[in-house]
């Protein structure tokens, strides 16, 4: 019999990417089929044709009777069976190698993107995210481990189905050709035999024992395939019931505005207010409102330049409104809410109309505020 080492090395690589049932199936294939076929079975069928004798001297009669009784040798039939049931497993191994090759390409591309981000400062987060999604799709985990999911899982299930089909097909073919037992005497009536002759088989009982043993091994392999198929199927159903979702498809809703970032009636945001808050009454022409970064999620970090510009605009507005003799609306008279200052609002009497309060600024005043601070206004409150 030929050398089985090449096939054995290929099938041995499948062990790392198979389930427990698949590993048991491979062990049965190696020990009870390949090893037994290469040692005991081959020696039992070594004299198969030479020891086949018929009670006639007609030349060629023994050959045609042997061909009629055994269209294919049992040993060669079992070799074909082993090859056919191993092909689906080898195809699954080819898919695993394809995934590993994809992993190498994705890792190389990921390293290149990281180098570009470090040298040029480019934003490659989206590209890295796409690479992670592809790795998850192919079933690639950290440290080069391949997990059975997606297309790889489907290939594994298909390989189990084909192995089961081949097992059943070869069992039926064997039963149809010569059954599962051998007789000591075979009757043959075929040209060029002059009449019906009797032919005798060498060691029929020993060969029958090996046939039954190989039959049991085939049935065990078929049972392992069916058990593994149900195991993979129910495990997939169990994972779906548990609600294991894709980590790269998490549901994220819109961020809700912070509750302690000021009242929604103000038209400024203080760096963190919700952009959907209702606006205050329209500001006078030329009123430039400088806001902080809306994307900042913390209410403690403010843009210093924006705060100074807001105070300058507020002082200029008070100066302009004081010269015109009009009062400032309540929406602009409110002091800006800075959480770091922790300013408490003042309570007014119910009979007095709400008027703008004078604000004591601890910071340096701008030019506009310094000119307007010395001018009295008729709507100032006495404190």
Swiss-Prot record:
Residue positions where Phosphotyrosine is found in the record: 248
Compositionally biased residues, Polar residues: 318-333
Residues annotated as transmembrane: 24-44, 77-97, 157-177, 209-229
One MF annotation (Gene Ontology) recorded for this entry: gap junction hemi-channel activity
PTM entry text: Phosphorylation at Ser-326, Ser-329 and Ser-331 by CK1 modulates gap junction assembly. Phosphorylated at Ser-369 by PRKCG; phosphorylation induces disassembly of gap junction plaques and inhibition of gap junction activity. Phosphorylation at Ser-369 by PRKCD triggers its internalization into small vesicles leading to proteasome-mediated degradation. Sumoylated with SUMO1, SUMO2 and SUMO3, which may regulate the level of functional Cx43 gap junctions at the plasma membrane. May be desumoylated by SENP1 or SENP2.
Cross-link (Glycyl lysine isopeptide (Lys-Gly) (interchain with G-Cter in SUMO)): 145, 238
Start and end residues of each stretch annotated as Interaction with NOV: 245-383
Compositionally biased intervals (Low complexity): 363-375
GO BP annotations, alphabetical order: adult heart development; ATP transport; blood vessel morphogenesis; bone development; bone remodeling; cell communication; cell communication by electrical coupling; cell-cell signaling
Topology Extracellular: residue spans: 45-76, 178-208
Alphabetic keyword roster: Acetylation, Cell junction, Cell membrane, Disulfide bond, Endoplasmic reticulum, Gap junction, Isopeptide bond, Membrane, Phosphoprotein, S-nitrosylation, Transmembrane, Transmembrane helix, Ubl conjugation
S-nitrosocysteine: residues bearing it: 272
Region annotated Interaction with UBQLN4, chain positions: 265-383
Residues in compartment: Cytoplasmic: 2-23, 98-156, 230-383
Annotated positions of the Phosphoserine modification: 5, 256, 258, 263, 307, 315, 326, 329, 331, 345, 366, 369-370, 374
Membrane topology, record value: Multi-pass membrane protein
Assigned protein family: Belongs to the connexin family. Alpha-type (group II) subfamily.
Quaternary assembly: A connexon is composed of a hexamer of connexins. Interacts with SGSM3. Interacts with RIC1/CIP150. Interacts with CNST and CSNK1D. Interacts (via C-terminus) with TJP1. Interacts (via C-terminus) with SRC (via SH3 domain). Interacts (not ubiquitinated) with UBQLN4 (via UBA domain). Interacts with NOV. Interacts with TMEM65. Interacts with ANK3/ANKG and PKP2.
Listed name of the protein: Gap junction alpha-1 protein
């Amino acid at each position: 019999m030929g050398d089985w080492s090449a096939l054995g090395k290929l099938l041995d690589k499948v062990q790392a990417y198979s389930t427990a049932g698949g590993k048991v199936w491979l062990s049965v294939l190696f020990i009870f089929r390949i090893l037994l076929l290469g040692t005991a079975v081959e020696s039992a069928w070594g004299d198969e044709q030479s020891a086949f004798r018929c009670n006639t001297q007609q030349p060629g009669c023994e050959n045609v009777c042997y061909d009629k009784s055994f269209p294919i040798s049992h040993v060669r039939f079992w070799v074909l069976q082993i090859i056919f049931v191993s092909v689906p497993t080898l195809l699954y191994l080819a898919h695993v190698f394809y995934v590993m090759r994809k992993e190498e390409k994705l890792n190389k591309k990921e390293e290149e993107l990281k180098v570009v981000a470090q040298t040029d400062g480019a934003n490659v987060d989206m590209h890295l995210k796409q690479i992670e999604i592809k790795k998850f799709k192919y079933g690639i985990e950290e440290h080069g481990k391949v997990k059975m999911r997606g297309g790889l899982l489907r290939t594994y299930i298909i390989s189990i189905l084909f192995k089961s089909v081949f097992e059943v097909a070869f069992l039926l073919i064997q039963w149809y050709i010569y059954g599962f037992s051998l007789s000591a005497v075979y009757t043959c009536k075929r040209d060029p035999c002059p009449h019906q002759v009797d032919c005798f088989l060498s060691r029929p009982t020993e060969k029958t024992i090996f046939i039954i043993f190989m039959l049991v091994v085939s049935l065990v392999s078929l049972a392992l395939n069916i058990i593994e198929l149900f195991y993979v199927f129910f495990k997939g159903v169990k994972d779906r019931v548990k609600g294991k979702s894709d980590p790269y498809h998490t549901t994220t809703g819109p961020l809700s505005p912070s509750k302690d970032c000021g009242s929604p009636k103000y038209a400024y945001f203080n760096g963190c207010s919700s952009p959907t808050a209702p606006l205050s009454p329209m500001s006078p022409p030329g009123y430039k409102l400088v806001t902080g970064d809306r994307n900042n999620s913390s209410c403690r970090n403010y843009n210093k330049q924006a705060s100074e510009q807001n105070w300058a605009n507020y002082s200029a507005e008070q100066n302009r409104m004081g010269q015109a003799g009009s009062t400032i609306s309540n929406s602009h008279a409110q002091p800006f809410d800075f959480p770091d200052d922790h300013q408490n609002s003042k309570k007014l009497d119910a009979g007095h109309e709400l008027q703008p309060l004078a604000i004591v600024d601890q910071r340096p005043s701008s030019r506009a505020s310094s000119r307007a601070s010395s001018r009295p206004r008729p709507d100032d409150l006495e404190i």
